[in-house]
Amino acid sequence: MNINRTTTAMLDALHDAGNADVWEQFDRRYRPILIGFARNLGLTDQDSADIAQETLARFLSEYRDGRYDREKGRLGAWLVGIARYRILDLRRRSAGKYQLAGESAIVDLDDEKNLSKVWEDERRHAVLRIAMEELQANSRTDPKTIKVFEMLMVHSVPPQSVADELEISVHDVYLAKSRVAQRLRKIVERIESEYDDDA
């Protein structure tokens, strides 16, 4: 069984309490999404990390107890629900001492559509981050070409400024962007297929 391929295979393998590899894979896949999700709801970095840890621990316990039914909803929605209750518990425990940035957490936490959007945005960010890391580590793409793409697409640096800083032509900037985008698109598609039944 290839636990790196799909959420389905990973979930099946999680029933084996002795399979630490699959748990590590699951953790690597979902912890960053959960941390980003909590941060986007106004939690501090430390509280976001704590919420992610509590959510993952609760997930594993409930999953192994047979409480997750794929017919009733997607894994992402279930993780959002667990995280939501962990955040509400944090608010209750803090009894007014905890101040969230931005909108009221209660309003945000009651808006399922907003929560789903925050989750999906974080999921997309995680996929792109993983794809960029893979492109940098495993491809023969020139690091300068990748830097062009990052400057343009991640940091929104104007093409002329990228060309000036890297001492290349604007035409070369656009060529580099196109090459990296094409390679990155293929990696993203493969990674998305690993999350195939979790959207």
Q: At which residue positions do the language-model features occur?
A:
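Sigma70-family region 2
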Residues: 15-16, 40-43, 54-72, 93-95
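Short, aromatic/basic-enriched loop-to-helix "N-cap" motif that marks the start
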Residues: 63-81, 170, 175
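DNA-recognition helix of helix-turn-helix
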Residues: 158-190
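Short amphipathic alpha helix immediately N-terminal
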Residues: 26-27, 134-161
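Internal acidic/polar
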Residues: 2-10, 97-120
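Arg/Lys-rich amphipathic alpha helix in sigma70-family domain 2
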Residues: 65, 80-101
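A short, charge-rich alpha-helical start-of-domain segment used by transcription regulators
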Residues: 16-36
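Conserved RNAP core-binding helix
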Residues: 2-11, 27-28, 35, 45-65, ...
